[in-house]
Amino acid sequence: EALGANVEFMDAEHHDLVLAVTSHAPHLIAYTMVGVADDLGRVTDKEVINFSAAGFRDFTRIAASDPTMWRDVFLHNKEATLEILGRFTEELFDLQRAIRRGDGDQLFEYFDRTRAIRRSIIDAGQDTEAANFGRGSVDE
């Protein structure tokens, strides 16, 4: 607190789960997407650079993180990370199945629900321009 940090108290298991969903899994997803782009022989590096939009650029920014640190994070918090990755894999499989079946309603409902979540985060005061995203204490 003396350094301006917001201190939150939670038990270790809950902390690990929160960080797995908000930090660890997004890093693994970013590493994976950048790796897939690199491994996809039919897409050249020039095309990846020329056609990448903000989302992919964010993946490359995240994937540029320190590999030693992230290896250690994943191995230290493997239980929570594996739980979140399992849930992510299930959701991804459901979306894959909806695309395969041409189920536009399922896709729309999923995208609409997740868009509403993002909007509620913004409505709750997240400021994407602020260095700390406008976060105060969770209790505020």
What is each PLM-predicted segment?
Residues D45-T114:
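Interdomain hinge/lid region at the active-site interface
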Residues A116-E140:
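Long, positively charged, glycine-interspersed low-complexity recognition regions
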